[in-house]
Design a protein with these regions (language model features):
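Active-site alpha-helical elements of protease catalytic centers
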Residues: 181-194, 339-351
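Short alpha-helical segments and helix-capping/turn motifs at coil-helix boundaries
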Residues: 14, 67-73, 335-341
Length: 452
């Protein structure tokens, strides 16, 4: 549990919820309000065996225990004297045999210009507004809009028409195996409901009801040197698709980033002098980490026998030239792990993948259990520059930076997720996927989030 608390701290700080410092005396009480009907969801009477520390004897009980467990983790970190209520239910959500909406959570209401509000004309989600004001600003009955969060999760998961073979893991120990860890998804979605959410329309740049929101108030675009509230709508639209250049400027978030994020991977070119310097990279989700397996060597373009001949998707023709070198390959045609494996089989000690679209380099997903060499991606523009220097004896090191944090800007502020093109439901209201270790509020579940 200690590590999971640490992984959650940065999300808390960024959500502006840790304004006074959390402590046992101030811990928030988060109450799960059961909105399910008889014999469904939390009230499902199906008998089950205890699993992973979850002692419930029915399916409904285990679901509720998992919900309350996640709520208690958040509550231990949040200083609030006002009870936080979560309207919660299990419902059939959008689902196919290959994709599914796992669940969602968000604030039920927002408040602005209340007593003790730190910023005027600024929307605050219900739980945060109540904490700051010291009173419940919207009192009322349970299971109504007087509750602070609304959470819905997919009751159909694992069924014949909804990601068959998956299903929710209801244990509290992180040992989900091939199932989907409900506690991890709950922690993420509760984060949105507690304040990790932008109210700006990312497609139009418009503010919500003509007011700024507390989350977006801290977004800073390093390209134009402006905070989001000071931008025009047109500028905000552009900023929402400015990958790697939008940071969260909150003091607590920056402090936690420096204490939690690891050092970023980088490509350091030492020769020829005309292109020497540090280049930003995207990491691979397979093979060894760059930090554990740094390599230095001459860079050689991989050549295969099928056009396009530099993507390493068919038999390599220059294996001898690649042996003991760092291979450069182009993105496209086949999976990242296939390219890296081909270079490794030819004797390469590392791989540089050149992006095939404009913009920042992305992370490389996929599975490569036999891959033992490090690999990184560089941008398309940097690829053009470095390819032009290959004939001059391009020499580089793939390693971890000594100064730059993974997932942070040059000032150490955590980056938010602003891919191009825009990803509805994911852009802006998540941390950037370049963070290492991965963070709770990234747009996808990852192995770093087990509540260990």
């Amino acid at each position: 549990m200690k590590n999971f608390f640490r992984k959650t701290c940065l999300a808390v700080a960024t959500g502006a919820l840790l304004l006074a410092g959390a402590g046992a005396a101030n811990a928030a009480t988060i109450t799960i309000v059961n909105a399910d009907g008889a014999n469904e969801g939390f009230n499902d009477p199906t008998p089950v065996l205890p699993v992973g520390g979850n002692t419930g004897t029915t399916l409904g009980q285990q679901r509720l225990i998992a919900f309350q467990f996640a709520a208690d983790v958040w509550g231990a970190l949040l200083p609030s004297a006002v009870e936080i209520r979560v309207t919660a239910s299990f419902d059939p959500l959008t689902c196919t045999t290959t994709t599914a909406v796992l669940g969602s959570a968000g604030p039920r209401t927002y408040s602005a210009d209340f007593a003790n509000a730190p910023l005027a004309a600024t929307w605050y989600p219900a739980a945060l507004a109540n904490k700051l004001s010291g009173v419940d600003l919207n009192p009322g009955a349970m299971n109504s809009t007087a509750d602070d969060l609304r959470a819905q999760f997919n009751v159909s998961l694992g069924g014949a028409t909804c990601l068959p073979g998956s299903g929710w893991y209801l244990g509290l120990d992180g040992n989900a195996g091939s199932s989907i860890n409900l506690v991890v998804v709950l922690m993420h979605e509760f984060g949105h409901g507690l304040g990790f959410i932008s109210l700006v329309n990312n497609s139009t740049g418009a503010l919500f009801s003509s007011k700024r929101d507390v989350y977006s108030n801290f977004l800073y675009d390093n390209t134009v040197g402006m905070l989001w509230p000071d931008m025009t709508s047109t500028q905000r639209v552009a900023s929402a698709i400015n990958p790697g250049n939008v940071a969260f400027t909150g003091q607590w978030a920056t402090w936690n980033a420096d204490n939690w994020l690891g050092y970023a991977s980088e490509l350091l070119v030492s020769a020829p002098a005309g292109v020497a310097g540090s280049y930003n990279v995207g990491d691979a989700g397979f093979g060894p980490t760059v930090a554990s397996t740094p390599v230095t060597g001459q860079v050689v373009l991989a050549i295969d026998d099928t056009a396009p001949t530099s993507d390493a998707c068919s038999a390599l023709q220059n294996a001898a030239a690649l042996s003991g070198k760092i291979a450069m390959v182009d993105r496209g045609t086949c999976a990242f792990a296939v390219k890296v494996q081909a270079a490794q089989d030819a004797g390469a000690i590392g791989v540089i993948v050149v992006n095939n679209v404009a913009g920042a380099p992305s992370s490389m997903g996929g599975s490569g259990p036999a891959v033992t060499i490090p690999s990184v991606m560089i941008s398309q523009a940097d690829g053009v520059t470095l390819k032009a220097a290959l004939a001059s004896g391009l020499t580089a090191t793939i390693h971890s930076s000594a100064t730059k944090r993974a997932g942070a800007d040059p000032l150490g502020r955590p980056l938010v997720y602003t891919p191009n093109p825009l990803q509805s439901g994911s852009s802006v209201s998540h941390f950037d996927t370049s963070a290492m270790p991965n963070l709770l509020m990234e747009p996808a579940i990852n192995s770093d989030l087990d509540p260990d």
